[in-house]
């Protein structure tokens, strides 16, 4: 905790960078930047300590590639789960939710379903963060900027002034209104997707016993599964070195366009097991076994952001969920945050990037990332429709559904974020050839 009224640099550096938000993306970004001694990096987190929800998060091949490029592969592999032999390449097996009938599998060769417990992953990243970078109890309440600097203000009366402010502060971002002023872009707020997600964690052995008692295969506990049905689907995958199984059961209201969350309803609530079981009444034996093992589920109202017109305003940029929050149906949210972190950290670490041209660098980042992140938002929402027999041109046609599931992730997974870096640097060399460096 910094005691004085302003967080200031103590030694001259090539760039001073303030990061708002200490989630997985923000901390990974800070770790990557901290390896360059010419960068002054300060991270501000509203909470009194780093913390993440106790849930699983899955990564596709593109996200695993970003983790490697960020230099976090060893930390990740120590805690990551993967599909057991002979299912190493399976991302998910897809089944009919009414009777457990196997439909197909989505394969990610060499990676399969790579997953971790969120809190464990954040802890592993934090272990690589040098002391003195993180500041806690720093809730951002506003951002402003001048010609040669940007300033973030916090609710404890302190401020940070630097060359760059990066908002990695989530779907309820305090930095976003500065980047997209309401008077120019209208009020941009998260909207309910129409989907509730019931979450729970089950000890793996308990689920294996429950599955066998229902006449189902116990391997369904260890191989990632997706059970599909009309307006509903359930996913499972192992975490904590296969000690636990992460479960998320989704239900979507498609009765009206753009459904609204009841006024005043909390986004996350503890609910009864009976409510959850009622939602999935009549589903398969395996699904009943899974849900009966969750005595105290939580229900999440899944929110997302519209596709934003821009992510940057001069020296201020938003990334991760602050810029492109999405529903989790492609397991892509954390991966996009990590891609963002790698691409921008690499650009800012280039010796040619300095205070006088950093706005141009942020603009180049936006140019190479905007269309991809918007497409991930859009297709993540569409994926939920596909899984719940509501996909456009697919519906409940299982032959079309299978074709879609076997190919829909290739463009997402077969992406190397270093190509974004190359494209951005090529753009910068062209646009700033007279004054770069």
Regions of interest found by a model, annotated:
Residues 29, 53, 145-146, 175-178, ...:
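Short glycine-/acidic-enriched loop or helix-start segments at secondary-structure transitions
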Residues 53-128:
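Active-site-adjacent segment of FAD-dependent monooxygenases/related oxidoreductases
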Residues 111-112, 116, 122-294:
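Conserved FAD-binding catalytic core of PHBH/FMO-like flavoproteins
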Residues 3-15, 87, 93-94, 100, ...:
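C-terminal helical "tail/cap" subdomain of flavin- and related membrane-associated enzymes
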Residues 16, 40, 244:
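Residues at the starts of beta-strands that form the adenosine-phosphate
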Residues 19-36, 44-47, 166-167, 198, ...:
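Conserved mid-domain beta->alpha element of the FAD-binding
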Residues 17-20, 140:
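A generic "structured core" feature
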Residues 2-17, 46, 50-53, 57, ...:
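Conserved N-terminal glycine/acidic-rich loop preference
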